[in-house]
C-alpha cells in the first residue's frame, strides 16, 4: 500500500513538474515588416493570445515575445485589417491584447508601428498584459466611437501596460490622445516621448484609475499635444508619480499642461525632478498645473526639485528643493539621441544641476539615466534630459580624422578638429553631443574628388542603417561667436540622410538626426559637385545642402555664400540653403524614415546664385522641395522666427522658393531680388517668396521690399491650384496678382507698408525691425502669438520675449520692434 501510494505521488509529482515546465516555457514569434512575406503583427498577436499557430505565425505559450524583425528598407509594421465592427478578438481594427505579450523592436527609428484612422492601435483587454519596447507607434483614432479613449493605446481595468524606450505620436481620442489607463492594473511608462497627439481631455495621457493604483511615469517627454477641452499634456483622475520628466509646449482651451481632475486632498499625486513649463491655455496664457478641487480640497502629495511655471489652485503636503526660477531654456523638440525626441537644456537653464543631490529617499532621488539612456550625475538636471558633452572640438585647424570609424575623434597632433569630428561621427554612428567653442573654423582643405569628407565642405552622413547617427554641434554664445568659414570652392556644410538610386527617384533613407546651435556659416562658393548622387541633381546650396534625414538649425546665420553654374555646369539652386525633405513617392516603401528640417531663430542673408555659363538659376536665399501627401509622418520644412533678407538670384526667385509641405511662422522676407540684370518682364517668380503646392501654412509672416527685376514682387504661387494657406496675421506689401492666398485671410494686411528700419544685429542675429508706428507692431493678439501648429512662440529671432504682462500682443515678422540705435559716427550697424 505504501509502495502503491508512493508511486502515485511520484507520478503526480512528475506530472506537476511537466505541467510547470510547460507553463514556464515562453514562445518567441518573429514578426516581419510590411512588404515582406511571413508572419505579420496582427497574426502574431492572435497566435500569442490563443497559444495556437495562426497564418504564418507559430503558436504562443506563456508570456510570448514578438520580435519585430529589422528591415532596413521597410521599417513599418501596420495594424493590418481596418475596423469593420466593434470586436475585441483581434480580427479587425485595433490590436487586442488578451494574454501576456512582449513586443520587442530594434529602436524607435527602425521599428515603426502604424495604427488605423478609425480605431486605436493597441487595446490591452482585462487580464491582458502588454510590454512594448523600443518602437515608434504612429496614429490611431477613436474620436466619435462608443469606447473613444486611448488614441494610440488603451489599458482596460484588470490589465497591465508597460512601455519602455519608445515614441507615441499622432493619436486622437476623447480621453488620452496617446495613452488611456483605467481601473486596476499598473501602468508604467519609462523613457517614452509622447507628442503630436490630441484629445478632448488629456491630449497626451489620461488616467482614471482608483486610489491606490499608482501610474509610474519616469523620464517622459510630453510635448506638442492638444486638448480641445482641458489638459493638453496629462489629465488625471487617479494617482501618478512623475519623475525626471518634461511636460512642455502642450495646449488646451482649458489647462495647457497637467490637470488633477478630482476634488479633494490626495497623497497619491507626486512630482520629483521634473519640469512643467511653457504650456498654454486657449487665451495664450501660461498654464502648467491645475487642480480641480476647491480651496482646502486641492492638496497634492509631494513636489520635490520640480520646476512648475504657472500653478493654479494646487497646494502640496510637502515641498523640497524646488527651483526659484522657471526659466528652463528648452530647445525645440528633437532627436538628441536614442530616436526618442527630447528638449535639450540650453546654456543658462535653471534646470541644469537642479535635481535632488541625495538618494536617501528613492522616490525623490534622480533616476540613474535620462530619457535617452544617458547616465545622470549625482545632482542631476531636472526633466527628461541630462546635459552631457560627449566631445569637445579643441582645434581650429582643418585636419581630417586619422582613422574614421574607430569611435575616437583624432586628427594630426592628437587634436579633435571640426572636420575630424564629423568624419568620425559619420563613420561610427551613435550619439554625439559636441561642444564647439567660440572662434573661427576655417575650412581650407581643397575638395578631394576621391574622398568627399576629406576636403571642401563639412559632410554629415550615415550610409548605414545600423547604429543610427544623432549628431549635435553646440556652438557657444551668440549666433556670431562660433563661425564656420569656407575658403575653398565648395559649400560650407552638407547633411545627407538619403541617397537616390536611379531615374525613378527610388530613395534609400538612413536614420540620421543632425542639429546645429549658435553658429554663423559663410564663405561657401559652389561651382562643382562631383558627389551629387540624386538623379537630375544640380548645384545645390552655397551655404548648406540638406538631403533627407531629420535636421534642426537653431540660432544660426547663413550669409555671404554663392552658387555659380559655370560651363559645362548645370542648373544652380539656393545661394544660401537648399533643403530636400522628400521621403517617398509612388514606387517605394510606405512611410520610410520621414525627412524633416526645422530652422528656428535664424537668418539667411546676402547670399547669391549666378549663372555665368548661361544656365538656369533659382533662389538666392532658400530653395526647399518638400514631401508630398504620400509622406504620412513628415513635417517637411518648417521655419520659425527667421529673416531671409538681401539675397539675390541672377534669374529666378530672390528670397525663397518653397515647394511641397512647408510652414513659416514669424518670418520676415525682406529686400531680396531676382533677375536684376535682366530687362523688365524677363525674370520669373517672385523676388520675395515663391510657393508651390497646397500643403503649406503661413502665420504671422512679413514680406516686403522685394524686387523681380525692377518691379516690386513679394509673393507668387507658381503651380496650378497652389496657394499660401493663411492662418492669420500675415503682412505682404506687394502681393501682386499671382499670389493666391487661401485659409483665414480676415486678419491679413495686404498692400501695406510695414515701415521697416535698416538691418540691425543683436546677439549676432541680423534682422529688420518694424518702426514704432508700423502696422506690424502689436498686430497679433496674445491668443494668436503661435506657430502654425497653434503652440505659443515665447521668443523672437534675437531671443527677446515675444510678449510681456504689460504688452501681451505680438508683432508680425521675425522680431519684436526695437528702437534703432544711434551711433556718434552716424553709421548704422
Residue ranges with predicted function:
Residues 18, 22-149, 155, 266-518, ...:
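N-terminal, post-signal-peptide segments of secreted/periplasmic proteins
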Amino acid at each position: 500500500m505504501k509502495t502503491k501510494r508512493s508511486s502515485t505521488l511520484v507520478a503526480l509529482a512528475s506530472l506537476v513538474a511537466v505541467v510547470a515546465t510547460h507553463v514556464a516555457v515562453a514562445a518567441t514569434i518573429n514578426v516581419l515588416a510590411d512588404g515582406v512575406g511571413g508572419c505579420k503583427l496582427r497574426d502574431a498577436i492572435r497566435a500569442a493570445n490563443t497559444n495556437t499557430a495562426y497564418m504564418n505565425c507559430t503558436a504562443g505559450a506563456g508570456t510570448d515575445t514578438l520580435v519585430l524583425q529589422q528591415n532596413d528598407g521597410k521599417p513599418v509594421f501596420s495594424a493590418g485589417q481596418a475596423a469593420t465592427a466593434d470586436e475585441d478578438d483581434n480580427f479587425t481594427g485595433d490590436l487586442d491584447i488578451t494574454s501576456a505579450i512582449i513586443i520587442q523592436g530594434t529602436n524607435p527609428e527602425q521599428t515603426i508601428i502604424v495604427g488605423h484612422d478609425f480605431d486605436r492601435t493597441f487595446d490591452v483587454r482585462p487580464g491582458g498584459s502588454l510590454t512594448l519596447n523600443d518602437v515608434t507607434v504612429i496614429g490611431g483614432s477613436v474620436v466619435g466611437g462608443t469606447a473613444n479613449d486611448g488614441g494610440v493605446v488603451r489599458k482596460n481595468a484588470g490589465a497591465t501596460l508597460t512601455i519602455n524606450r519608445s515614441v507615441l505620436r499622432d493619436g486622437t481620442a476623447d480621453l488620452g490622445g496617446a495613452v488611456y489607463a483605467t481601473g486596476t492594473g499598473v501602468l508604467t511608462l519609462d523613457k517614452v516621448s509622447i507628442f503630436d497627439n490630441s484629445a478632448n481631455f488629456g491630449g497626451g495621457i489620461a488616467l482614471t484609475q482608483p486610489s491606490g493604483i499608482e501610474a509610474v511615469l519616469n523620464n517622459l517627454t510630453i510635448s506638442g499635444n492638444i486638448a480641445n477641452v482641458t489638459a493638453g499634456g496629462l489629465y488625471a483622475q487617479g494617482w501618478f508619480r512623475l519623475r525626471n520628466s518634461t511636460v512642455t509646449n502642450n495646449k488646451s482651451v482649458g489647462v495647457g499642461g497637467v490637470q488633477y481632475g478630482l476634488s479633494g486632498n490626495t497623497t497619491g499625486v507626486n512630482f520629483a525632478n521634473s519640469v512643467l513649463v511653457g504650456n498654454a491655455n486657449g487665451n495664450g496664457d501660461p498654464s502648467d498645473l491645475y487642480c480641480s478641487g476647491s480651496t482646502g480640497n486641492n492638496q497634492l502629495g509631494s513636489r520635490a526639485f520640480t520646476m512648475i511655471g504657472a500653478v493654479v489652485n494646487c497646494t502640496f503636503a510637502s515641498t523640497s528643493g524646488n527651483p526659484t526660477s522657471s526659466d528652463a531654456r528648452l530647445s525645440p523638440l528633437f532627436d538628441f539621441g536614442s530616436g526618442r525626441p527630447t528638449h535639450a537644456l540650453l546654456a543658462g537653464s535653471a534646470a541644469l544641476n537642479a535635481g535632488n543631490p541625495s538618494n536617501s529617499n528613492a522616490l525623490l532621488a534622480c533616476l540613474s539615466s535620462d530619457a535617452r539612456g544617458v547616465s545622470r550625475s549625482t545632482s542631476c538636471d531636472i526633466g527628461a534630459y541630462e546635459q552631457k558633452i560627449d566631445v569637445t572640438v579643441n582645434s581650429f585647424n582643418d585636419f581630417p580624422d586619422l582613422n574614421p570609424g574607430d569611435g575616437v575623434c583624432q586628427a594630426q597632433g592628437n587634436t579633435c578638429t571640426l572636420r575630424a569630428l564629423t568624419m568620425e561621427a559619420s563613420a561610427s554612428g551613435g550619439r554625439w553631443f559636441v561642444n564647439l567653442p567660440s572662434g573661427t573654423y576655417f575650412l581650407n582643405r581643397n575638395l578631394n574628388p576621391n574622398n568627399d569628407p576629406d576636403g571642401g565642405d563639412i559632410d554629415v552622413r550615415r550610409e548605414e542603417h545600423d547604429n543610427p547617427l544623432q549628431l549635435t554641434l553646440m556652438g557657444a554664445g551668440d549666433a556670431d561667436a562660433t563661425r564656420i568659414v569656407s575658403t575653398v570652392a565648395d559649400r560650407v556644410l552638407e547633411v545627407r540622410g538619403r541617397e537616390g538610386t536611379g531615374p525613378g527617384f527610388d530613395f534609400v533613407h538612413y536614420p540620421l538626426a543632425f542639429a546645429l546651435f549658435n553658429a554663423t556659416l559663410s564663405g561657401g562658393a559652389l561651382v562643382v559637385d562631383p558627389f551629387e548622387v540624386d538623379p537630375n541633381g544640380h548645384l545645390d546650396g552655397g551655404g548648406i545642402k540638406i538631403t533627407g534625414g531629420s535636421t534642426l538649425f537653431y540660432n544660426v546665420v547663413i550669409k555671404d555664400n554663392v552658387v555659380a553654374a559655370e560651363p559645362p555646369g548645370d542648373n544652380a539652386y539656393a545661394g544660401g540653403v537648399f533643403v530636400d525633405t522628400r521621403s517617398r513617392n509612388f514606387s517605394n516603401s510606405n512611410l520610410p524614415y520621414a525627412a524633416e528640417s526645422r530652422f528656428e531663430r535664424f537668418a539667411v542673408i546676402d547670399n547669391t546664385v549666378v549663372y555665368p555659363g548661361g544656365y538656369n538659376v533659382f533662389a538666392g536665399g532658400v530653395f526647399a522641395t518638400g514631401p508630398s501627401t504620400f509622406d504620412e509622418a513628415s513635417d517637411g520644412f518648417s521655419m520659425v522666427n527667421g529673416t531671409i533678407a538681401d539675397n539675390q538670384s541672377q534669374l529666378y526667385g530672390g528670397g525663397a522658393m518653397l515647394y511641397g509641405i512647408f510652414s513659416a511662422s514669424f518670418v520676415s522676407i525682406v529686400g531680396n531680388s531676382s533677375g536684376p540684370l535682366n530687362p523688365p518682364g524677363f525674370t520669373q517668380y517672385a523676388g520675395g517668396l515663391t510657393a508651390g503646392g497646397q500643403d503649406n501654412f503661413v502665420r504671422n509672416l512679413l514680406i516686403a521690399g522685394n524686387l523681380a527685376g525692377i518691379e516690386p514682387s513679394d509673393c507668387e504661387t507658381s503651380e496650378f491650384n497652389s496657394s499660401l494657406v493663411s492662418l492669420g496675421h500675415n503682412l505682404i506689401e506687394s502681393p501682386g496678382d499671382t499670389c493666391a492666398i487661401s485659409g483665414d485671410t480676415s486678419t491679413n494686411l495686404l498692400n501695406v507698408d510695414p515701415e521697416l528700419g535698416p538691418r540691425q544685429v543683436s546677439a549676432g542675429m541680423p534682422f529688420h525691425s518694424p518702426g514704432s508706428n508700423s502696422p506690424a507692431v502689436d498686430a497679433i493678439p496674445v491668443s494668436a502669438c503661435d506657430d502654425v501648429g497653434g503652440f505659443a512662440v515665447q521668443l523672437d529671432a534675437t531671443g527677446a520675449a515675444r510678449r510681456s504682462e504689460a504688452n501681451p500682443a505680438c508683432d508680425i515678422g521675425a522680431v519684436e520692434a526695437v528702437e534703432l540705435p544711434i551711433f556718434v559716427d552716424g553709421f548704422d550697424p
